[in-house]
Regions:
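SAM/dcSAM-binding transferase cores
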Residues: 13, 168, 175-219
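A short SAM/SAH-binding and catalytic strip from SAM-dependent methyltransferases
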Residues: 113-129
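A short glycine-rich, Lys/Arg-flanked "PGG" loop and its adjoining helix->strand segment in the class I
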Residues: 129-146
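Short conserved loop adjoining the S-adenosyl-L-methionine
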Residues: 103-110, 127
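Conserved class I S-adenosyl-L-methionine
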Residues: 148-170
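Class I SAM-dependent methyltransferase SAM/SAH-binding core
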Residues: 43-45, 49-104
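Class I SAM-dependent methyltransferase Rossmann-like catalytic core
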Residues: 1-39
Length: 219
């Protein structure tokens, strides 16, 4: 049975829900990233963007939003429509694409990007596909780009260690880490899916090769 993603997003209406905590965590990191970058132009891509509020709400509140070129990829028609309506209501110019974020064609003209959001992707694919996605991420990134991703903590196992190692193997440096569930509950109850948020920065040459790097840790 396929997931009703619009019903899944209903949890965001509760400010104390795990999803709402995760969104606030992601939004803090997006805002900090924008503060840290003084570029005149920045390119952002959000895969499986849902209603796009994690990014769009941040942009709507910023006077420097015009320097951001944002592309949102979302397959669900209702969620894509909600993102478009929010963007229009707040005079945000974004490229909203109804398409499969798992195909390279969907990113045509939008990458390489300075910020790549993989929020909600890693908990909804197989482990093999997750590994392959991380391996492909350098192709979506400019030199020094940032990747923000989220992953739930599941009763069947926590892939945090493996995911961090996979990122490191592709030349990414972990910048910061946030676990909203830990702040709110102190621990993750067995059987519950609790969100982790990671922020990795890509360090690579202008060529296609990927090289590891050292840097600050913020997440």
């Amino acid at each position: 049975m396929s997931t009703d993603w619009q019903a899944w997003h209903a949890a965001y209406a509760d400010p104390d829900s795990d999803l709402s905590r995760r969104r606030r965590s992601v939004q803090r990191q997006i805002a900090q990233w924008l503060d840290d970058r003084n570029d005149d132009r920045l390119r952002v891509v959000s895969a499986c963007a849902g209603d796009g509020r994690d990014l769009l709400e941040v942009l709507a509140a910023r006077p420097d939003r015009a320097r951001v070129t944002a592309t949102l990829l979302e397959l669900d028609e209702g969620l894509a429509r909600a993102a478009a309506e929010f963007a229009a209501a707040h005079d945000l110019v974004v490229d909203l694409r109804r398409g499969d974020a798992g195909t390279t064609d969907s990113y045509a003209g939008a990458v390489p990007a300075d910020l790549v959001q993989m929020c909600g992707v890693f908990g909804n694919v197989t482990d093999d596909d997750l590994r392959a996605t991380i391996a492909a991420l350098p192709q979506l990134c400019t030199p020094g780009a940032t990747v923000i991703w989220t992953r739930g903590r599941f009763a069947t196992g926590d892939l945090t260690g493996e995911i961090r190692a996979w990122f490191g193997g592709e030349g990414f440096e972990e910048v910061t880490f946030d676990a909203p569930w830990a702040r709110s509950t102190g621990s993750a109850p067995t059987g519950w899916s609790r969100p982790h948020v990671r922020w990795h920065r890509a360090r690579r040459s202008s060529a296609s090769s990927v090289s590891p790097a050292c840097g600050r840790s913020r997440w």
